[in-house]
Amino acid sequence: DYEDVNVKGLNAELRGYQKLGYRWLKNLDYYHLGGILADDMGLGKTVQILAVILSYVNENGKNAKPSIVICPSSLSLNWLNEVKKFAPSLKCIAIGGNAIQREKQIEKIPSCNIIITSYELLKRDIDLYKEKNYEFKYAIADEAQYIKNNNTQNARAIKVINAETRYALTGTPIENSLSELWSIFDYIMPGYLFGHKKFKEEYETPIVKDEDENAMDKLKQLIEPFVLRRVKKEVLTELPDKTVTVLYNEMGEEQKALYKSYLAIAKKEVKQEISENGFEKSQIKILSLLMRLRQICCHPSLFLSNYKGESSKLNQCIEVLKDAISSGHKICLLYTSDAADEL
């Protein structure tokens, strides 16, 4: 009965399909199994996971182990804000800053309910996690396509994390090959789909090269209990007319340093301009400087033609677009600068 789902402290009214997802995740956890929540973009994978974590903390109180969320760096702030919005009682920290700051944050993990870190920072800090040997209740790989290649540092690092139950969140469990699915399963339940060599021999090669339907049916039977995917058209009656999701973004170190440098220059120029001409006659100059700072926030190359670094906002935009396109959605992308079209 999915109607009796009531997680104390959850600031959200779960829809029917979300209650089903919550129960599915809880049942997997009960049997010490992992799973892939592969719902379509916009169906609330985050709130379903937070409901599970909050339920566990409610049941175990001070004895509750921390859980860890690993996501693209552009989504760390969004996860932090989602926790504050839907489960404010959970003690949560987002790992960030320089190496010394991150080490201090990692030392505080036992006193937290949720830890948020990025794939990039996990790779850098993995020796610290090994040294501390923390045991997490849940390890959640968001945008799990980041670990679809078993030979990457992302995949190797996340598999080191010691957790009772592992979940993967993705709208696209398979993008190019069955080996991607194997890699994600090797994270949530190591060994379940055998070693990579045996998996290729028994499933991937027969299915891809020989179009072996028997091998395909066997693989479907193996993975079906551990993959839950709902698309919007299946749950359309439960969705509101429009869903508004605000994504927050934090600049990377190079972009942030550039912004701070120009901010300091802008402050001096504004102070001098007002001193010489007064506020009323300085407004155009002030607006020009604000526009320059705004361009740096969007992408520094809009203002600096020789900038070769990244823009965290553009990276996040690309991730959202990829997720939407892979789910078959149509997209209307609006921007206020003609120069942004060239990015």
Name each model-derived stretch:
Residues 1-211, 220-337:
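ASCE P-loop NTPase motor core, strongest for the SF2 helicase catalytic module
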Residues 338-343:
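A short, hydrophobic C-terminal helix/tail in secreted or cell-surface proteins
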